[in-house]
Amino acid sequence: MKTRLLSFLLLFLLVCSAQSQTYQPTEENLKSRQEFRDNRFGIFLHWGIYSMLATGEWTMTNKNLNYKEYAKLAGGFYPAKFDAARWVSAIKASGAKYICFTSRHHDGFSMFHTRFSDYNIVDATPFKRDILKELADECHKQGIRLHLYYSHIDWYREDAPWGRTGRGTGRPNPKGDWNSYYKFMNNQLTELLTNYGKIGAIWFDGWWDQDQNPDFDWQLPGQYAMIHRLQPACLVGNNHHQAPFAGEDIQIFERDLPGENRAGLSGQDISALPLETCETMNGMWGYKITDQDYKSTKTLIHYLVKAAGKDANLLMNIGPQPDGELPAVALERLAEVGEWMKVYGETIYGTRGGCIAPHPWGVTTQSCLLYTSPSPRDCS
């Protein structure tokens, strides 16, 4: 009886110990968080074979395109004008300190060379070049940090469980094979964190696809732990529209500044983690030929300033063209924002949100600066 009681107590203590364990970021990770906050400005790049259709990155599900037919787009994807050096140079000139690139979006096409699926930029297209490798090499060369977007959704793979999107793409098994799919994702993440040098962050998206299935378990703790094991300094963020989960290093807000919820996607509480808001330069994330509603340079600068005033980074999105070039208007905006940043960038970089709440006339930061329209002035 005593032996059984002792065994029970030991088991109870082990369970309690396991439950009490929480994510403890390493010193390298904490340093990366501060550097992330100091950088304040990044550029998001949504690019994939969906750019060929020129109707945005969600066309596959919005138009219920059959997954096998959609995959044929890869056979014609040849972005002959892609030049990683030109991309990175233009982005660096804007004052942005990092790039977040869509390594794999919801359509399941990998924009890097992976051993775990033939459905990728090298094996499935006539282009035959690892775009991510070229971009990563150029980022490291020019001193721009590289973050990688990675979708938890896949409208192409048959082992990916169905969520509330991608239900009309013709995949045969709604339940999929979670163990197979989870292993596939972790294998790809291992490649991304092994073959492309230092990665500043993994930017997840798609958790919300299972929000109508509360019992679904994405098994995020194991995935996050793997990332931190492979690159301890790599930050983990998840665009799940919730308060941060254990193991995450940054908090993401989509199309809204922290504390605002005008788009209906960012009503979550604000945490003590570094903050980032992502917004489009025009209307769409991926390239859409009819979307010429680009925000003015003044509007983009004001958004950057407001984000800094709310202690958040701005991740501003561009959808590259199918030929591999950045749209001309986007290049103009980058150059114009860059001119402003040359003069006032020191009032953005390294700042923290001010003690006075943002107002229509401007915002404050802990660098003791008052930002007013159209330019900041010293308030010391």
Feature map (PLM): residue ranges:
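Bacterial N-terminal signal peptides
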Residues: 7-15
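Ordered hydrophobic segments in well-structured contexts
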Residues: 13, 370-371
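Mature catalytic domains of secreted/periplasmic carbohydrate-active enzymes
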Residues: 21-370
